[in-house]
Regions:
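Generic alpha-helical secondary structure signal
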Residues: 48, 62, 66-70, 74, ...
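An internal, D/E-rich "acidic patch" concept
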Residues: 59-116
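Alpha-helical transmembrane segments of integral membrane proteins
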Residues: 2-3, 16, 97-130, 146, ...
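Hydrophobic aliphatic residues
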Residues: 26-30, 41, 74-75, 83, ...
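Residue-level recognition of pore/gate-forming positions within transmembrane alpha-helices
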Residues: 12, 43-44, 139, 155, ...
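Hydrophobic alpha-helical transmembrane segments of membrane transport/permease proteins
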Residues: 15-68, 161-178
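Membrane-water interface segments at the C-terminal ends of transmembrane alpha-helices
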Residues: 21-30, 57-58, 72, 136-165, ...
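N-terminal signal-anchor/signal peptide hydrophobic helix marking the start
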Residues: 6-12
Length: 311
């Protein structure tokens, strides 16, 4: 296990370095960051100001030197200042990260509490109306795009019926403001949970030891939840960790549709406005979250399934 952990930490470090190189290269391909300053106010800047600004931002040095200086500061927690807000990137990200985590957690809870039980029910009641309902839910959930679900939810429940707010997030905790964004973001994953849980449960329910347990007179609920579900939960567990990380890193569309003040919407704005410090900070944060969650899921295998061992 120790060798596995050390190896994974090494891979995580290499991945973060590759992500930093990619982000830095793409930021330079999109244009000189000084152009953003030149466009402010609509009057531009003089050549002397252009050169002075380049020295201030370190843009007068070769690209490898620029990257090295930026990487050293990033490892120290200094990602620079936002070119739009004129605030430190850590402060700008800190203002939005809690909103994104709230949205991701709500979507994950919806997907888990709907998809997993529905998958178990569909497997236990195979070829019944519950099975057909579950498979239809999975089909619709994985074919309808999330932005369409969000837009239709706003049109029906906010505009037509007036039951729920159409978007934005107040400063206080409001359950009504979470309902539509969380359902829209978690719908696709709930369908994935359902299909994965159903498939895993069917494989386990058809195994010999389950048939033996039933032959010994073990109650149906005990067979399903103690014996079958425990062994069928590993594939959904893998999916769970990756999906939770995906909610955090991939909520750009939903945050844009519902005007949610989170990291996804901020990442989109930083890309369109060429705000490199914020864009780099968000991408590195997203990469780190995904790698850490994936690592924790892999480690949890050994504790859930004793058959799995890491060398």
């Amino acid at each position: 296990m120790q060798r596995f952990i050390l190896r994974r930490f090494f891979y995580m470090l290499v991945t973060m370095l590759c992500a930093s190189v990619l982000v830095f290269a793409l930021s330079r391909l999109t244009g000189d960051p000084r152009l953003l300053y030149a466009q402010e106010g609509g009057y531009g800047i003089t050549p002397e100001q252009w050169e002075a600004l380049g020295k201030q931002l370190g843009l007068d040095k070769p690209y490898p030197v620029q990257y090295g200086n930026w990487l050293v500061r990033a490892f120290k927690g200094d990602l620079g200042r936002s070119m739009l807000d004129r605030k430190p990137v850590t402060e700008v990200v800190g203002e939005r990260i809690f909103n994104t985590f709230q949205l991701a957690l709500g979507a994950w809870l919806f997907a888990t509490l709907v998809g997993v039980p529905l998958g178990v029910l569909s497997a236990v009641k195979r070829a019944s109306i519950w099975d057909y309902f579950g498979r239809s839910f999975a089909l619709l959930g994985q074919t309808l795009p999330v932005f369409w679900i969000g837009i239709m939810g706003i049109l029906i429940f906010a505009v037509k019926l007036g039951w729920l707010p159409s978007g934005t997030k107040p400063d206080y905790i409001s359950v009504k403001h979470f309902i539509m964004p969380c359902i829209a973001l978690g719908w696709f994953s709930a369908a994935g949970y359902m299909r994965l849980t159903r498939s895993a449960m069917l494989d386990v329910l058809d195994s010999e030891y389950i048939k033996l347990a039933r032959a010994k007179g073990v109650s149906g609920s005990l067979v399903v939840w103690k014996h079958a579900f425990r062994n069928a939960i590993i594939p959904p567990l893998t999916f769970s960790g990756l999906i939770l990380a995906g909610f955090v890193t991939g909520a750009v569309v939903i945050e844009t549709v519902f005007a949610w003040p989170g990291l996804g919407r901020m990442a989109y704005t930083s890309v369109t406005q060429n705000d490199f410090p914020v864009m780099a900070g968000v991408v590195l944060l997203f990469t780190g979250i995904f790698l850490i969650v994936n690592f924790l899921v892999d480690v949890s295998y050994a504790y859930i399934d004793p058959r799995i061992r890491y060398g």
